[in-house]
């Protein structure tokens, strides 16, 4: 099986199926049971670990931590009842636009 973005969709389906499951049955169910703040904190921790690996020049660490980061992002999406497809649509909307133009349209500096 080739690796591609559809893996994220499949993983999200598994994560979403764990919502409301017994927290003792899986790590994902345990995270989801803790709520959005705990899921957001874990995502932040994984983001920092990814940055540390990148700054350290640890390519393998970047790959591993990025996988953790994406997993925890999907957990947060499920916890906050946000469909990743909405994020994909927003990325598609922004595609081809200058980052500076996009920021100006949002009133950012």
Curated annotation (Swiss-Prot):
Belongs to the PRA-PH family. GO terms for biological process: L-histidine biosynthetic process. InterPro entries: HisE, PRib-ATP_PPHydrolase-like. The lineage of its organism: Bacteria, Pseudomonadati, Pseudomonadota, Alphaproteobacteria, Hyphomicrobiales. Keywords: Amino-acid biosynthesis, ATP-binding, Cytoplasm, Histidine biosynthesis, Hydrolase, Nucleotide-binding. It comes from Parvibaculum lavamentivorans (strain DS-1 / DSM 13023 / NCIMB 13966). One of its GO terms (molecular function) is ATP binding. It catalyses: 1-(5-phospho-beta-D-ribosyl)-ATP + H2O = 1-(5-phospho-beta-D-ribosyl)-5'-AMP + diphosphate + H(+). This is Phosphoribosyl-ATP pyrophosphatase. Transmembrane segments: none annotated. One of its GO terms (cellular component) is cytoplasm. The keyword Cytoplasm applies. It is found in: Cytoplasm. Pfam families: PRA-PH.
């Amino acid at each position: 099986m080739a690796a591609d973005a559809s893996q994220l969709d499949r993983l999200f389906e598994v994560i979403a199926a764990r919502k409301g499951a017994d927290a003792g049955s899986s790590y994902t169910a345990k995270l989801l049971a803790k709520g959005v703040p705990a899921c957001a904190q874990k995502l932040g921790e994984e983001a920092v670990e990814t940055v540390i690996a990148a700054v350290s020049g640890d390519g393998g660490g970047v790959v591993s931590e990025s996988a953790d980061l994406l997993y925890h992002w999907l957990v947060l999406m499920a916890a906050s009842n946000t469909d990743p497809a909405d994020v994909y649509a927003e990325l598609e909307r922004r595609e081809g636009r200058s980052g500076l133009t996009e920021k100006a349209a949002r009133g950012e500096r």
